Amino acid sequence: MKIILILVLVLVVSINALNNQFLHISDVHYSSAMNSLLYNASVMCIGPTVTKEFDHKEHEDLIEDTERLNLPTNGLYGRYGCDTNQLLLSEVISEMLNVNSNPDFIIYTGDGAGHGLPNGPWSESQSTLAKSLYGAYPNTQFIPTIGNNDVFPDYNSQCNDSNLQFLYETWAQWIPTNQVSSFLYRGSFVVSPVSGLTIISLNTILYSVKNKNTFSTPQDPCGQFAWLEQQLIAAKQAGNSVYIIGHIFPGLDPFYLQGTWKSQYQTAFFNITSDYQTTITAGFFGHIHRDEIRSIQFDNPSLTNNHYFPMFIGSSITPVYFNNPTFKQFTYDSQSKNITDITAYFSDVYISNLKGHMNWTEEYDFVSIYDIDNQYGIGGDQLNSLMERMVSSNSIFNNYDNFRSGSYLSDSPSMTCLINAATIDELNACTYIAANVA
C-alpha cells in the first residue's frame, strides 16, 4: 500500500513539475469579420497585386493539382494580406497544444484584434480570442501585454481610460488580484509564474511615436517608469531574474528605419534598466510581424563592462503583412532563467490552403541553426556575437532573413546593423563602418 501511495505521489509531482519551457505568441489580429474565402472589399485585405506566392517553386505542383481537381480551399486558412480568420485561429491554438499542452507559462505580446475594425467587431474579436486561449490553457499562467490594436482607436492609450477597463474585463482571468489597480491605471502589471522569475508587462503604447495623447506627467506617462523601477528593485532584492515584455520594442522599425518610441522615453527606459543589467535576463516584444532579435548595449558610466539587452521579437500569427503564421517555444535554465534555446513553428498559408489542412513544421532550432554556445544561455552578448557573424557570413544572414517572415519571402530592408542600433545615429555609424570594412 505504501509503495502504491509513493508511486501515486511521484506521478502527481511529475505531472505538475515544470518543464522549463514557455510559449511566445504575438500579433494574432483575429477578426470576427474576416471571411478570406470571399477576398473582396468587404474583408479589408491588402491587395493581391503585391503578393508573391507564385514565386515559390515548391508551390507549382500544388497549383497544378488544385486547378486540375478544382479544390475549394483557396483562402480557407486565410490569405497573405488578410488578418486571422476563425479557422486559422483554431488551428494555431491546436498546434500550440500539440507542441506543448502544459508550458510553464505563455507570453503574449499584444495585438489581438484585426486591423481597421469598427468598435463592435473589435470588442467581439478581443473577447473571442481571450475565451479561445483561456479555453485551451485554463490552468496555464497566460501573460498578456497591450498592443496598439488592443486599444480603440488604434494607439489611443491613456491613463485610467475605458480601454483599460475593457481589457481588464476581457483579461481578468490573467491579471493577478494585487495588480488590478496598476493595470486599470496604466495598463501594466507584474507576475511571478515560476519561482525565481519576475515578468514585468509594460504598456509600451504609452511611449509610441504614434500615440498623440498628452499626459499630466509628460516625462513619465501614467507613472510607469517609476513603477517599473519599483518592480526592478523588488526583483533584485528577492534575487529574481526579470523578463520585460511589451508590444512595441525600444529601437528602430525595420521597414521605416525610424524610432518606435519617442526618443525621451527610450532614453528614460535604458537609463533605468542599465542599473539592473544583471537582474534583467531578456525582453520579449512584437509589433513588426517579423521574427527578429535586438541586442542593445546598456550605457552605465559607473560600469566598465556594460552588458547587452537581448530582445526577442515575436513574429505574427496573422499573415496580413505577407508572412506565414509563426509562434515559438523557449527553453530556459531552471536556476538562472537564462534562455537556452528557441524553437520556431510555422505553417505555409498557401500550401495549407492548397492541401486543405495546415502543414505545421518546425522552422528552426536556434542553437543548432546558428551554432550557438548556450552554456551560459542566449543573452545579449551571444546575440551581439551572432550579429557579428552575420556580417561575415551570407549563409547565416540568409537564414535569419528567411526566418523573419516565417519562411515566406525575404522582404529585406533587414540589415545586421539594426540588431544593435537603438537610434538612427547608431544605425548610420554602424552602416558606415560596415561599408568601409567591406
From Swiss-Prot:
Entry cofactors: Zn(2+)
GO biological process: ceramide biosynthetic process; sphingomyelin catabolic process
Keyword hit for Zinc: yes
Keywords assigned: Glycoprotein, Glycosidase, Hydrolase, Metal-binding, Secreted, Signal, Zinc
EC number in record: 3.1.4.-
Major localization class: secreted
Gene Ontology CC terms, in alphabetical order: extracellular space; membrane
Cleavable signal peptide: 1-17
Pfam families: ASMase_C (PF19272), Metallophos (PF00149)
Superkingdom in the source lineage: Eukaryota
Free-text comment on the cofactor: Binds 2 Zn(2+) per subunit.
Binding site for Zn(2+) 1: 27, 29, 111, 289
Glycan attachment sites: 40, 160, 271, 338, 359
Family: Belongs to the acid sphingomyelinase family.
Protein name (record): Sphingomyelinase phosphodiesterase D
Species assigned in the record: Dictyostelium discoideum
